Swiss-Prot record:
Record GO cellular component, one term: HslUV protease complex
Source organism: Thermosynechococcus vestitus (strain NIES-2133 / IAM M-273 / BP-1)
Pfam families: AAA_2, ClpB_D2-small, zf-C4_ClpX
Protein name from the UniProt record: ATP-dependent Clp protease ATP-binding subunit ClpX
Known function: ATP-dependent specificity component of the Clp protease. It directs the protease to specific substrates. Can perform chaperone functions in the absence of ClpP.
SMART domains the UniProt entry points to: AAA (SM00382), ClpB_D2-small (SM01086), zf-C4_ClpX (SM00994)
Cited PANTHER family: ATP-DEPENDENT CLP PROTEASE ATP-BINDING SUBUNIT CLPX-LIKE, MITOCHONDRIAL (PTHR48102:SF7), ATP-DEPENDENT CLP PROTEASE ATP-BINDING SUBUNIT CLPX-LIKE, MITOCHONDRIAL-RELATED (PTHR48102)
C-alpha cells in the first residue's frame, strides 16, 4: 500500500506547499491561496459585466448569509429575564422555577457579550465570566425544548450533542471537537457567529464515572470525556476539523474560541435523590395539607432541590467539571394536568399540529376535553414524559389519517374518550351535500 505523499501541491497551479502561504485541502484535491485570489478576480470580472448580477450571487452564498439580528447586539436589545420567561411560557409548559433560572442566566450571559462588544468595560477592570447551566430532570420534562426555545428567541446558532457518543481522543467514537463542528455548521461556517452560540449537551449524566473513587483503568467514555470537556466549557481556542477528525486526518483545522459560547448540559441523573437522602440523614417524607403523602415523582423533585455539588461528585461527575457549570436548574416531573396542557396550550401544541394536518384535507379535527384527559392519563402511565404524547396520538390517528385523504364527503372528525381508551372508530360528520335525500 502506497504511503501518503508528504509533498502536497496545488491541484490547479502545481505549486508545492512550501511555495505558497496557504494550501487548502478538499476531498482528494488542494488549492493554494494564490489560485483562490485568482478565482475571486475572475468571478468579480464576470459579475461586473452582467447588470444586477452581483447582489443576488452574493446573497446565494450560504457562508455569507446574514442573520436577522446584528452580530453585535446592543444591550438595549437583549431580552430582559421577564421577557425571556414569557417567551418560554409560550412553548414550554410548567417548570416555572427552572425557566426563571434559565432566563436570568441567559440574560447575564448575553449582557456580558454586549459589554465586550461595546468596549465599555469601565475603569474597574472587572472581568465578567460566563456561567454555564446544568438542567436536571426526568426524560420528557422539557430540557432540550427549553434550550431550543432560548436559541430561537436570541437568534443565535444552536447545536445539540449527545454525550453518550463522545469518547476520549484516540478511541472509537466522536471527539469533543465534533460538538463545536455542529455549531459551526449551523452558523453556516461563520466562526464569529458560532462563537456567540449555544450548545446543548444531552445525556450528560451518562458520562459519570462508575464510582466516586478514581479508577486504575481508563474510563474513555466517562471520566475521560469529562476531562476532555473541561477546557471547552471554561473557554479555550479549540482546533475544529471542518470534515470531522476521525475520517479526514489530513486537513486544516478551524480555530474557535469557546469563551463566549454558552453551554447547557442536561441529564436525568436517575438515583441522584437517593444520594441526597443519604447526605441529609433521613428520607424526606412529604405530606399535603389533608394528610395524603405526596406522589413519588413530586417527592423526588423536592429532594433534588436540596442538591449540593458534592452530591453530583458522589454520583460520578468530577469536581472540576461541576465547578464549570455553576447554574443548576431542577425540572419537575410532569403530572397529568401538565401533560394535558402540553397537548393544547403551547404555541406549537401537539393537537394543533394534527388539526392543521387535517385542515389540509378540508376536515376539521376536534378533541373532546375528556379525550384530552384520557391521552394525558395514558402518557402519565408510560413514564416517558411529554414524549409519550405523540406516540399515543399517532396510534389514535392512524386509521383516521389513512381514510380521510380518500374521502371527500367528510367535514368534521371528533376524537372521543372511547377512541382513546378502546381505540374505537372516530365520530365523522359528513358534508350536507353528501347526505342522502329522501324521495317523495
Amino acid at each position: 500500500m502506497a504511503k501518503y505523499d508528504t509533498h502536497l501541491k496545488c491541484s490547479f497551479c502545481g505549486k508545492s506547499q512550501e511555495q505558497v502561504r496557504k494550501l487548502i485541502a478538499g476531498p482528494g484535491v488542494y488549492i493554494c491561496d494564490e489560485c483562490v485570489e485568482l478565482c475571486n478576480e475572475i468571478l468579480d470580472e464576470e459579475l461586473a459585466t452582467v447588470p444586477n448580477a452581483a447582489a443576488p450571487r452574493r446573497e446565494s452564498t450560504p457562508s455569507r448569509s446574514p442573520r436577522s439580528t446584528p452580530r453585535s447586539r446592543p444591550l438595549s436589545q437583549v431580552p430582559k429575564p421577564r421577557q425571556i420567561k414569557e417567551f418560554l411560557d409560550k412553548h414550554v409548559v410548567g417548570q416555572h422555577e427552572a425557566k426563571k433560572i434559565l432566563a436570568v442566566a441567559v440574560y447575564n450571559h448575553y449582557k456580558r457579550l454586549s459589554l465586550l462588544d461595546s468596549d465599555q468595560r469601565g475603569d474597574d477592570n472587572v472581568e465578567l465570566q460566563k456561567s454555564n447551566i446544568l438542567l436536571i430532570g426526568p426524560t420528557g420534562s422539557g430540557k432540550t425544548l427549553s434550550a431550543q426555545t432560548l436559541a430561537k428567541l436570541l437568534d443565535v446558532p444552536f447545536a445539540v450533542a449527545d454525550a453518550t457518543t463522545l469518547t476520549e481522543a484516540g478511541y472509537v467514537g466522536e471527539d469533543v471537537e465534533n460538538i463545536l463542528l455542529r455549531l459551526l455548521q449551523n452558523a453556516n461556517m461563520d466562526v464569529e457567529e458560532a462563537q456567540r452560540g449555544i450548545i446543548y449537551i444531552d445525556e450528560i449524566d451518562k458520562i459519570a464515572r462508575k464510582s466516586e473513587n478514581p479508577s486504575i483503568t481508563r474510563d474513555v467514555s466517562g471520566e475521560g470525556v469529562q476531562q476532555a470537556l473541561l477546557k471547552i466549557l471554561e473557554g479555550t481556542i479549540a482546533n475544529v476539523p471542518p470534515q470531522g477528525g476521525r475520517k479526514h486526518p489530513y486537513q486544516d483545522c478551524i480555530q474557535i474560541d469557546t469563551t463566549n459560547i454558552l453551554f447547557i448540559c442536561g441529564g436525568a441523573f436517575v438515583g441522584l435523590e437517593k444520594t441526597i437522602e443519604q447526605r441529609v440523614g433521613k428520607k424526606a417524607m412529604g405530606f399535603v395539607r389533608d394528610g395524603e403523602p405526596l406522589p413519588k415523582e413530586k417527592r423526588s423533585a423536592d429532594i433534588l432541590k436540596q442538591l449540593e455539588p458534592h452530591d453530583l461528585v458522589k454520583y460520578g461527575m468530577i469536581p472540576e467539571f461541576i465547578g464549570r457549570i455553576p447554574v443548576v436548574a431542577v425540572l419537575e416531573p410532569l403530572d397529568v394536568a401538565a401533560l394535558a396542557d402540553i397537548l393544547t396550550q403551547p404555541q406549537n401544541a401537539l393537537l394543533k399540529q394534527y388539526q392543521k394536518l387535517m385542515r389540509m384535507d378540508s376536515v376539521e379535527l376536534r378533541f373532546e376535553p375528556a379525550a384530552v384527559e384520557a391521552i394525558a392519563q395514558e402518557a402519565y402511565r408510560r413514564k416517558t414524559g411529554a414524549r409519550a404524547l405523540r406516540a399515543i396520538v399517532e396510534e389514535i390517528m392512524l386509521d383516521v389519517m389513512y381514510e380521510l385523504p380518500s374521502r371527500k364527503d367528510l367535514r368534521e372528525c371528533t376524537i372521543t374518550p372511547e377512541m382513546v381508551e378502546k381505540r374505537s372508530t372516530a365520530e365523522l360528520l359528513l358534508h350536507p351535500s353528501s347526505l342522502p335525500t329522501l324521495s317523495a
